[in-house]
Amino acid sequence: DVNLQGTINLCAALEKVGAPRAFIFISTVAVYGCDYGVNITEEYPLNGTTPYAMSKRLAEEYLQNWCRKYNVVLGIIRPSLIAGPNPPGNLGAMITGICRGRYFSIADGRPRKSVLMVQDIANLIPLLVRKGGIYNVCDSYQPTFRDLETLICKQMNKSLPLSIPYWLAKGMALIGDCLGCLLYTSPS
């Protein structure tokens, strides 16, 4: 797991060359485990249960202990959906899915998503180097998924994706999760 094991490996390497003054970790709002969220503060319980959310939460916990031990200023940023050139994560997967014709809109794309530009995150990092702390970061711009789909389709010269009902998407996800558990074999 890159988030936790990569963090542990990086800290071990830093111990050999000397701990830095500050460490900035880009986490995720997924650590809260909410399908939706309004006014979620940094004190909100960390209930994320997906492997991604859990790995980020465990990496945060590891860093909090490590930074305390080595007297390092720790800044943790928990961003929403990150946008920019070659976006990572869910937005990148959405773009790829639309381009390949393997993306379905859910519930007519009505849900909204806070979108944060990667440059905005970059602008925060120098501030956190001095101050540290944990910060949820989002933008006031909260387009619907249909807005995002329309923009992507227009830029990629693709047709808007077919929309499926929420209950069907949830059922398909559950079946996929079950199959994943049945078919997954641990690396030896």
Feature annotation, model-predicted:
Residues 184-188:
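Conserved small/polar residues in nucleotide/adenosyl-binding loops
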Residues 49-74:
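Active-site Tyr-X1-5-Lys
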Residues 128-182:
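Mid/C-terminal beta-alpha module of Rossmann-like enzyme folds, strongest
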Residues 87-93, 107-129, 136:
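Substrate-positioning beta->alpha
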Residues 8-51:
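Conserved Rossmann-fold NAD(P)-dependent oxidoreductase catalytic core, especially the SDR/UDP-sugar
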Residues 49-57, 81, 114-115, 142:
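Short-chain dehydrogenase/reductase
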